[in-house]
């Protein structure tokens, strides 16, 4: 049964009438950089140390009686998200774990280019999460007169004080998305993110529609941080006429895992014996190869066509309807937790925190 909670216009005030007055929540903002923190320079937009912290003081809505308290921690240096690595994921996750008992929720200001990767990684690293972690950013910097940053900031903070949300999300342009289902879909539009294979958790307009039945339920187990150890894994996207020698070179490296981005429902050429043999040999050596569709919508079904069945016979496992970003991060996470290949394969095909459906 679908359960949708509606809040109406002027949402902080009418919230009291709908749910009763919320207790004042304490939110920690982690500012990692990105467009939201950028100012114009001679080299284009670059994140500017101290700018966001100063600018937030001038946003009147943030001092509204029904908005949560917030504290902002700014990273130094601030990063364009193109420069994000596993080290930054570990730092963000560790900061959340360190302050976990002191705050009711966490908002992360982040660049848009790799936000889906960071959200996916955090969803696995923050085990048994029972507080909201919301990533947001903007397509136009907060430093510009016309920007999308202010609404994203205000609404992220407000949603972060809404009790039923206890998972890693992305909030962007009136939509709350599960973090490990999200993908960046536009470099130009304010509607920069979507979750093609999963409904929005909330839609924000005059009415605020929170789809409570879609929200992850806490496991009841103690919160635990699992940092990620960098492993030699790769994503390889197929294209018509690709050179098998390129894949051969990649598979000669000491790989632990490969995300193979295939056509349609998980298909690849089956008329090139060397290609299939390369994959089979790698699987036999203990390389975990995950079949992930290039299509934003739909799922991998390796029994549907002969071209998919050949990959299954070679030893590939199904990525089901996971995004390439979530598949990559989940593989890193599982390889860190357990070195047993069969264990990793088993858990790759299980939903750990809402990242896939069978």
Enumerate the predicted regions with their spans:
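Short acidic, glycine/serine/threonine-rich loops at helix termini
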Residues: 40-43, 119-120, 145-148, 178-184, ...
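C-terminal non-catalytic interaction/assembly regions of soluble proteins
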Residues: 265-358
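ATP/NTP phosphate-donor binding region
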Residues: 23-98
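Short Gly/Thr/Asp-enriched flexible loops that form oxyanion-binding sites at enzyme active sites
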Residues: 108-131, 270-278, 307
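Accessory alpha-helical/coil subdomains and C-terminal extensions
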Residues: 24, 30-34, 40, 52-64, ...
